[in-house]
Amino acid sequence: MSNVDELEIDKFSQLAHKWWDKDSEFKPLHEINPLRLDFIDRHASIAGKKVLDVGCGGGILAESMALRGAQVTGIDLAKKSLKVAQLHSLESGVPIDYRCVAVEDLAAEMPGAFDAVTCMEMLEHVPDPESVVRACSTLVKPGGWVFFSTLNRNAKAYLLAVVGAEYVLNMLPRGTHEYARFLKPSELGRMARHAGLGLQTLSGMGYNPVTRIYSLNDDTAVNYLMATRRAD
């Protein structure tokens, strides 16, 4: 069975034209991107490295990594989002190899091809996140880095990420997230371990609604980032 939720694909396809509008539904992604980029670069030193961005969407993270000197491949199954990413790459003059392919299929085609793999804000949108984690591990070279970011599953995450962000503050469209698909760090850590990835860093990501600034912290109750490394 394909590890694709067509409703999720359709959801992001309808918003595809807004990916690079920093005042749109994608504003939070633009705001957290510098934080994500620094977290990735601090661990993997991506300049000159081959990096794969899984679930790249409109290319926000992919372009920023390319601007840091990485050789970036971005993959997504939402064709409209991918077309936006390709056009923006051409307009920006930032070369990125974008492909419409499932991560599991790419893993079968290109095992061990990348120095680092990123899978950010994507696991909570697929039926089988463990399949994605395994594929990411297969795609990275021995000793390479795999980065994940997703949402914890608890009452606080539900109140802030679903009720607060989607229904009170209107930061995200209603229905963006399905709470049952949120992943506890322990669950994601277990998936990573079973895939041959060792946990290196676990960090929370917080948002101050007054200053409108995101920062890394020790609170993983809602959003969190995980840096893992494949054994040599």
From Swiss-Prot:
It comes from the Bacteria. Its EC number is 2.1.1.222, 2.1.1.64. It catalyses: a 3-demethylubiquinol + S-adenosyl-L-methionine = a ubiquinol + S-adenosyl-L-homocysteine + H(+); a 3-(all-trans-polyprenyl)benzene-1,2-diol + S-adenosyl-L-methionine = a 2-methoxy-6-(all-trans-polyprenyl)phenol + S-adenosyl-L-homocysteine + H(+). Keywords: Methyltransferase, S-adenosyl-L-methionine, Transferase, Ubiquinone biosynthesis. Coiled coil: none annotated. S-adenosyl-L-methionine binds at residues 36, 55, 76, 120. Signal peptide: none annotated. The keyword Acyltransferase does not apply. One of its GO terms (biological process) is methylation. O-methyltransferase that catalyzes the 2 O-methylation steps in the ubiquinone biosynthetic pathway. Belongs to the methyltransferase superfamily. UbiG/COQ3 family. This is Ubiquinone biosynthesis O-methyltransferase. The gene is ubiG.
